[in-house]
């Protein structure tokens, strides 16, 4: 069996391409000019840092990072410890409470413990200017995260992809449903959650699919990282 690739190996060539270098340079220029860009530079690639390529069991695709102060830390839907859960995450917790027996809604919104169990929390755009949703949407991040999904699709099998909303579902057309499991629902935002996100049971369904493959299920109760 060949050695399983790491993200570093799998994306090394992509990171040398002009579009990627230009994206990083644009973000660096904005920060240097005094603009506030979220998440902080050290957190931009946290989805890859916390969930190595060979450890990915589940992928939850987000869109772009939260654009309010102290929220975004490089994991889709997650916020830093001490920051209230934003509305979409409140609805994710509501669904978990109805779907997973014994789930107690936590008093925080940090999902790092999911990432450390193999849930890749991937935004399709990795930076945003403070207060301006989708401000970095056309930089090149989408091309990069398309590559990430292609790598997951080709290098791995049996991943459970949770695609919430039209943006994630469009992105998910890259995924081969014969190799992977694709679960779709409306976005958990208050605008659409009642159209079928609430009641989708994606969390128990993901665990059932993992167990069918002989894998450990995810403990969906988020625990705070040790200080």
From Swiss-Prot:
EC number in record: 3.2.2.27
SMART domains in UniProt: UDG, UreE_C
InterPro entries in UniProt: UDG_fam1, Ura-DNA_Glyclase_AS, Uracil-DNA_glycosylase-like, Uracil-DNA_glycosylase-like_sf
Main localization category: cytoplasm
GO cellular-component term (any): cytoplasm
Record localization: Cytoplasm
GO molecular function annotations of the record: uracil DNA N-glycosylase activity
Family to which the UniProt record says this protein belongs: Belongs to the uracil-DNA glycosylase (UDG) superfamily. UNG family.
Function comment: Excises uracil residues from the DNA which can arise as a result of misincorporation of dUMP residues by DNA polymerase or due to deamination of cytosine.
Protein name, UniProt field: Uracil-DNA glycosylase
Gene that encodes the chain: ung
């Amino acid at each position: 069996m060949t050695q399983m690739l790491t993200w570093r190996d799998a994306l090394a060539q992509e990171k040398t391409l002009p579009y990627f270098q230009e994206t990083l340079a644009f973000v660096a220029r904005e920060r240097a000019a005094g603009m506030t860009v979220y998440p902080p530079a050290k957190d931009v690639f946290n989805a890859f840092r916390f969930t190595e390529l060979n450890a990915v069991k589940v992928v939850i695709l987000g869109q772009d990072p939260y654009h309010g102060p102290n929220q975004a830390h490089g994991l889709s839907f997650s916020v830093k410890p001490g920051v209230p859960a934003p509305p979409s995450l409140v609805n994710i917790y509501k669904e978990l409470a109805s779907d997973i027996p014994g789930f107690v809604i936590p008093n925080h919104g940090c999902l790092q413990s999911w990432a450390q169990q193999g849930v890749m929390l991937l935004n399709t755009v990795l930076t945003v200017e403070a207060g301006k949703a989708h401000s970095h949407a056309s930089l090149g991040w989408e091309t990069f995260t398309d590559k990430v999904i292609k790598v997951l699709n080709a290098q791995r099998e049996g991943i459970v992809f949770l695609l919430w909303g039209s943006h994630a579902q469009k992105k998910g057309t890259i995924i081969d449903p014969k190799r992977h499991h694709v679960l779709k629902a409306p976005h958990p935002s208050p605008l659409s959650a009642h159209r079928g996100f609430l009641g989708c049971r994606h969390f128990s369904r993901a665990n059932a699919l993992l167990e069918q493959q002989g894998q450990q299920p995810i403990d969906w109760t988020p625990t705070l990282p040790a200080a």
